[in-house]
C-alpha cells in the first residue's frame, strides 16, 4: 500500500499504558534479543525489546515469530496497535515487526535506506515513548 508521501502523521494516540510498561522494563529486557544490533550496522547504538519479527530469510513468505518481548509488552501494545490499524488501514494486512527501540545515550542513527524487500511492502508506525 503506497501512501504517496514519505511521512504521514496519524495524530495522537493513548500510549500511556504502553509507555509505563516500556519504561518499567529492567536492563535485561533490553538485552534479550540482539539480532538487530548484530545484523544491521545502523542499529549498533540501540537496544530493543522485540515483540514480533518476520523471518527475512524466508521472504517473501511471511513467517512472523513472537520474540522475547511478546510476553513483556503484548498486553498493552496490542490494543494500541489494533486501534491504529483499524482507524488508518484497510482490512487484510499483517504486522511483520513490532518492538520497542531505544537509542543509547550519545548514540546516533545515520541516515540510511533499509535494503530488505520487506521494507518496500510495509509501513512503519512510530510511537514516541520518551525523548
Summary of predicted features, one role per range:
Residues 21, 46, 94, 110, ...:
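Residue-identity detector for threonine
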Residues 99-118:
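Conserved short histidine dyad/triad with adjacent acidic residue
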Residues 94-96, 123:
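A generic structural signal for short beta-strands and their flanking turns/coil linkers
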Residues 1-91:
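Non-heme Fe(II)/2-oxoglutarate
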Residues 32, 36, 112-117, 123-125:
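General "foldedness" signal
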Residues 102-104, 119-131:
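Short, conserved beta-strand element in jelly-roll/cupin
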